Each structure stands twice: as structure tokens, then as C-alpha cells.
Amino acid sequence: MYRILVINPGSSSTKVAVFEDEKKIAEKNVSHSVEELKKFKRSMDQEPLRRKAVEDFIDEVGYRIEDFSAIAARGGVLEPVPGGTYVVNEYMVDYLINRSPVDHVSNLAAVIGYKLGKPHGIPCFVVDPVSVDEMCDEARFSGIPEIERKSYSHALNIKAVLRKVSREMGKTPEEVKIVVAHLGSGISVCACKNGKIIDVNNANDEGPFSIERTGELPVGDVVKTAYSSKHSAAELKEEFTRKGGLLAYLGTKNLKKALDSMETSRKAKLVVEAMAYQIAKEIGGMCAVLGEKPDAIVITGGMAHEIRFVRMITDYIEKFGKVEVIPGELEMEALALGVLRVLRGEEKAMDYRSVVE
């Protein structure tokens, strides 16, 4: 039996769980108040606070760090890598702390796991990090040579959904062709073929607008705003990635509240319908990329809990293929199972430095 500690930081909470083989034994979502977090300039500065939350959880459930076979940490914004499970080492930790191109809370998980496990000889792994890059060559072109499209997505949940759906079909991930739409605070819509994410919108910069992100914007207007604005580049980026989308239009990040408002507000109705329209349009594009009818179109993520919203999307796309809805995220299970496959010898963990150099 293998006992695995799973660490998954979110923007305002830290999810921690204990798995024994495939079975989840304990789980906690530790909330962090705005007051706690606002004093930290960078996400990485939160590391001691988040690590203490993990240590407190381990104490609460009656374990010591030495009791674990391995630690599974959510993968951060690393250099582009193929999907899979990677050993966390000093090189990866240094990259996440000092060189990651995006200040993202997911960068904390591997650092926390490594610091907890190393003194006791407990290995730490990341599974399908945010920067999984398996895009086909055609998908990389942006329109100008100086800029290449980047693959930043909800790869962990996307890959977990791919495995789940293919297993239910009695096939391997390499044998199915599916489109996955992960709908959370950010949105990733991707085409999966031969077990790989061959195209995906960058969840920060492209695609549909979401709960708090603008998605793709008209280039001319972005340039005009940037040069006429009194805001710094960092402030503008925050406007686009944390203060845009549904929040900018309706003043709320609560999709249910926005859906309820549709009964009395024409503006709310139009905004929510526009978001569904843009998601459906992105899904249609990914169906085209596959080159043939997909085996399934999967809608997943937090927004998939709202059946009314899902229906708005499926009204557009159901003619493209079978639609399956998997609400929420499979991240904790995906992390644990990715590490379990390595511990059982079913899959080999990769060395991050060897892959990127």
C-alpha cells in the first residue's frame, strides 16, 4: 500500500489530501483570508503560510511526514514540457522560485512538497503541470514571427478527463479524439488526439471571456489602451486576467447569481449568453482541428455545475458530437493517481532538467 500526500494551492485556499493507493482517506480545503494574503507581494512569498497549513493538516489527521510514500504536488508554470509525471528536484524548485514567467499560486505546490519531503527522503512529484505543451506545429503560429502561441492550460484536469472518458469507452487515451472544455475562473478549450493536447487556447490570454478573465481581445484596442493608459503593464495584466469577464460586465464572479439575474436584467441575460456563445465557438474550432467528428465533447470545471449554463452551450454544439458533462475538477485524484502509477512501476517519472535542456 502506498500513502500519498496531495498538495494543491488555489488563489484563496490550499487543498490537501491523503490517499492510500486509489482511496482518499482524508481531505481539507484550508481557506486563506484576503487580509492574510494581501500582505504578500508575490505568490511565492506565501510559501511559509501555505506550508504551515499543510503541516497543520498532517498533524490533524494523525500522520507524520515520514509516514508517506510520496508527495504529489500540483505542477506550476514551468518551461514547456510533455504531459506526464516529473520528479521535483532543486533545479525545478529554483526555476519556480526565481525564473517562472508567470506569478501563479500553482508554483507553490512543488516548493512546499520538496521542502517537506527532502529532509525525510520522501520524493515529491508534479503531474501534468500548467505548462504541458504538446501542440502541433501549426497551432504555434500567432501571425508574427516574434510571438509564438504558448500552451498554458488546465492540463491536470484535462488529462484526467481524457483518461476517464477513454476508459469508459473501453479505449486508451491514444485511441480517442475528444474536445475538452474546462470552465473555471479561467477557460481552457482543447483538442485531444493520440493522447496529446494538440491545440488549446492559452487560458490567460486567449479564448472566450470567463468569470474574471477577458480572454482574447482586439489587438488594436489593447495597444491603444496600453499607450493611453496611466496603468502600468502589471496593472493592465491584472485588469485582463483578474478583473475582466463576467466580473467586469456584471460586478460578480458568481455564475449562479448572474444566471438568476437573467430573469430581470436584460444586460445579465446578454452577458451570460455571450459567454456561452464564445465558449461554443471555441469548441467548434477545436472540433475542426481534429479533422473528423470527435468521439466526445466534454464540458468540465466549476461552471459545469450550472446546468442552465451548460444547456446554453450544448444548444450550439450538440450537432458536432456526443456531449458529456463532468462537473468540477478531478485534480486531487489525478495528482494521486499520477504518482501512484510511478510508484507501481506502471509509468516512469521524468527528470525536468533533462527534458527542458
Curated annotation (Swiss-Prot):
Where's it mainly located? cytoplasm
What's a Pfam family in this record?
A: Acetate_kinase
Q: What is its EC number?
A: 2.7.2.7
Q: Which CDD domains match?
A: ASKHA_NBD_BK
Report the SS bond pairs.
none
Alphabetically list the UniProt keywords: ATP-binding, Cytoplasm, Kinase, Nucleotide-binding, Transferase
For this chain, the family text in UniProt reads:
Belongs to the acetokinase family.
This chain belongs to which protein, by name? Probable butyrate kinase 1
The scientific name of the source species is Thermotoga maritima (strain ATCC 43589 / DSM 3109 / JCM 10099 / NBRC 100826 / MSB8)
Source taxonomy: Bacteria, Thermotogati, Thermotogota, Thermotogae, Thermotogales
